[in-house]
Amino acid sequence: MKNKLRDKYPLYLANEPLQPNVSLKVEDKYTGEAVTSVALADAEIIERAIVAADDCFEKMINMASYERQEVLLHCVQRFREDFDEFAYALCVEAGKPIRDSRGEVSRLIDTFKIAAEESTRIYGEIQPLDISERAKGYRGMWKRVPIGPCSFISPFNFPLNLAAHKIAPAIAAGCPFVMKPASKTPLGAILIGGILAETNLPKGAFSILPASRDGSDLFTIDERFKLLSFTGSPEVGWDLKARSGKKKVVLELGGNAAVIIDKDSDIDSVVDRVIFGAFYQSGQSCISVQRVIVHEKIYDKFKKKFVEKTKKLISG
């Protein structure tokens, strides 16, 4: 793989790249060295992004479903073309093995492909209302409509996958958005922004803003946002929900996943699976194994093998 990072990366404000500074340093997670720089948004830039998203909403509503689908399919094609660049950037900024990075890029492509397919299948329903003589001949209709400008805050552990889970459905539904990617791993979302900027999305449809705490409260409290989607720790997520006002809030927080091991389980196989589930990516996954419930008849045998194999893990 012959790839390298650029010297600097912009943020994206109302569909356009902007390089006001190079304040955010991105580290190679393996060496700990700064390898590139990213533009950092301040409160004024965040405000401009929200204004643009709010102004753009009517234009997003008026996009035909096939037009939104074309945007998403363009992204699918471009992600495939730039597959190695995405994988390399993820490998460096997140410290993932290149095999896992490639897997996450594939998941990015799949997510946008599914969103493209669903963008033309946003249905409504007709239902009878003739429950009495007075209502004879009456029917009711409902349809799904875009909720409005969305605020997205994505985490560091799956910079592409978890950004895609927010961005692609928003485009499919016709919702403008402003995203704050994790400061530790901003490159994935910025690369997505670069490809979105090639499309005919109306100005203001998206902004991708790495940001410090200066002004970041706007992602949570600003009433022009009609939905906040946050992926991260329970402590932060519940605090954001408490301060978010009347907007809808979607929280994807840390889990408490359990494994149940019965007495007739293949212990060698189970031990390998539990170790992988618990220690993959240093346990930095919302579905990492955090509880192991073992039948008492095999507890000692499982514990012995589990400890032996865990001691052989190599960090770094």
Model-identified regions with their sequence ranges:
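Conserved C-terminal structural/oligomerization subdomain of aldehyde/semialdehyde dehydrogenase
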Residues: 33-37, 201, 260, 314
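Rossmann-like NAD(P) dinucleotide-binding subdomain of oxidoreductase/dehydrogenase enzymes
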Residues: 124, 128-269
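Glycine-rich phosphate/pyrophosphate-binding beta-alpha loops
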Residues: 43, 158, 280
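ALDH superfamily catalytic-core signature
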Residues: 235-316
